[in-house]
């Protein structure tokens, strides 16, 4: 889990638009966040395996 202060800081609108960054909506992780889902790679994988993300399925070929 991310520190609450950093999560709150990221939620505020920055003074300059380029300073804004994405965080995982579930755990607050700042890196490897998929914008389409708003989740980090770890949470995305866990939720996809649990079937909590509609339209996402494990690929096999």
Curated annotation (Swiss-Prot):
Ligand binding (Zn(2+)): 24, 27, 40, 43
Supply the alphabetized keyword list: Metal-binding, Ribonucleoprotein, Ribosomal protein, RNA-binding, rRNA-binding, Zinc
Mind telling me which GO cellular component terms the entry cites? cytoplasm; small ribosomal subunit
How is the cofactor bound, in the record's words?
Answer: Binds 1 zinc ion per subunit.
Q: Name one GO biological process term.
A: translation
Cofactor field: Zn(2+)
What's the superkingdom here? Bacteria
The family database entries (Pfam families) matched by this protein are listed as: Ribosomal_S14 (PF00253)
* InterPro entries documented for this protein: Ribosomal_uS14, Ribosomal_uS14_bact, Ribosomal_uS14_CS, Ribosomal_uS14_sf
MF terms from GO for this chain are: rRNA binding; structural constituent of ribosome; zinc ion binding
Q: Which PROSITE patterns match?
A: RIBOSOMAL_S14
Family the entry assigns? Belongs to the universal ribosomal protein uS14 family. Zinc-binding uS14 subfamily.
Report the protein's function: Binds 16S rRNA, required for the assembly of 30S particles and may also be responsible for determining the conformation of the 16S rRNA at the A site.
Subunit and partners = Part of the 30S ribosomal subunit. Contacts proteins S3 and S10.
Name listed for the protein in its UniProt record = Small ribosomal subunit protein uS14B
**Where does this protein come from, organism-wise?**
Mycobacterium marinum (strain ATCC BAA-535 / M)
